[in-house]
Every structure is written in structure tokens, then in C-alpha cells.
From Swiss-Prot:
Protein name: Protein PB1-F2
Stretches with biased composition (Polar residues): 1-16
Keyword annotations of the record: Apoptosis, Host cytoplasm, Host membrane, Host mitochondrion, Host mitochondrion inner membrane, Host nucleus, Host-virus interaction, Inhibition of host innate immune response by virus, Inhibition of host MAVS by virus, Inhibition of host RLR pathway by virus, Membrane, Modulation of host cell apoptosis by virus, Viral immunoevasion
Function (record text): Plays an important role in promoting lung pathology in both primary viral infection and secondary bacterial infection. Promotes alteration of mitochondrial morphology, dissipation of mitochondrial membrane potential, and cell death. Alternatively, inhibits the production of interferon in the infected cell at the level of host mitochondrial antiviral signaling MAVS. Its level of expression differs greatly depending on which cell type is infected, in a manner that is independent of the levels of expression of other viral proteins. Monocytic cells are more affected than epithelial cells.
InterPro entries associated with the record: Flu_proapoptotic_PB1-F2
Family: Belongs to the influenza viruses PB1-F2 family.
Site (Low pathogenicity): N66
Amino acid sequence: MEQEQDTPWTQSTEHINIQKKGGGQQTQRPEHPNSTLLMDHYLKITSRAGMHKQIVYWKQWLSLKNPTQDSLKTRVLKRWKLSSKREWIS
């Protein structure tokens, strides 16, 4: 009988077999730790209120028809001041 060579496939299946508990349940092996950290970091960044404000202001800017730079600046500043006041009040 030939002995099975260690291929990436057999190594990965051996690794899974080692992780089985006594009851036959397989423990979940986390994905690559860096991918988990990156996802956590991404979620923290995107959940910030500042990100939401940026999205809102970009949508407002895109919705304007032929804005001049001055009218755009005035409109955005007014909105920013209003939202800042609301944050201080609440």
C-alpha cells in the first residue's frame, strides 16, 4: 500500500478532523484573522455619523441642477449649521 502524500487538500482535511469535538460536532474555524480585523475596522468607520453626513451632502450636491459654486457653498453651509445645532440640542 502506498502512503498518502501530504497535499494541501489532505493537510486541510486533517486540520478539520483534528478540530472535531468528542460529540462529532466540528468547531468553527475562523476565517483569516486579518480579514476579520479589516471587516471590524470597516464597520467602525462606516458607522460613524460623519460618514453619514458626507453621504447626505454628496446626494444634495448631486441633486442640484446647474449649481454655481457660491450658491452651492451657501446651501451646504446653511445645512451644516442647522445639523450642528440639532446635535448640540439633542
